[in-house]
Every structure is written in structure tokens, then in C-alpha cells.
């Protein structure tokens, strides 16, 4: 576009090639947030790129599972710290295998959502694709509505 005094040039804020991105979580007795997690990351990344571990055969599949990859594993009663270590080991090992197919893997708790600053005017997948990530990148965490007032 040109103007008598100015030449307008369209500038793309990010120069990037879209990366293939997966999201990974584990849930137990948290269908409320799991359905929201699948909805949010499914729209951002595509349901087929979501990986969910349900902790226990007593867990129901989410109503909106769609094309998500869901694995149900037997629940083992453990102390909180043992359970956390077991969960992190499982998810880390699985994430490592996902890197055979994906450029990036997002790992979050089921009640955690990565969002791009609206001022960036871009989607999560486009924003992450624009970054030059060598090992890892992390976001700022904020609890919203953790406790009722």
C-alpha cells in the first residue's frame, strides 16, 4: 500500500515455521478441569496432539475426549511425595518419547493453562513456534480463583 508521503509495509511480527506441539497431563478425580484442559489445548493445538493419563481404572473418560490420546493406568496408593515423584517420572519419560514426533511438548497440571499476552495478537502455537527454544521455556504462573473469598 502506498500513500503520497508514506509507504506502508505489512510487517509480520513473527518469522517462524510452525512447530508440531503436543500437550501432556495427568488427572485423578478432576473431570471439571480435565474437560476444560482438553477444550483449551484442543483448540490451540488440535485434539490429536493431546496426551492424557488418567490415574486409576475408576476414572471416567471425559465427555469431550474427542481425538485426544487417553491412557488409563492403575492407581497405586502412595504418599504425596512418592506419588509426585512417580507422576513426574512417568510424564517425563513419556514426554521424551513424544519428542520423536513433536518439536515441542507442553507439560502442565490439568488445572494449568498457558496463555499468550493478548497484546501479542497471536495464538499459543504461533507464539511458541516463533521462539528459538534450545532446551526449555517456562511461563509466569498465576493462581486464579484458587480459594473462594
Functional labels for PLM-detected ranges:
Residues 116-147:
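Conserved donor-nucleotide/metal-binding helix-loop-beta segment in metal-dependent transferases, i.e.
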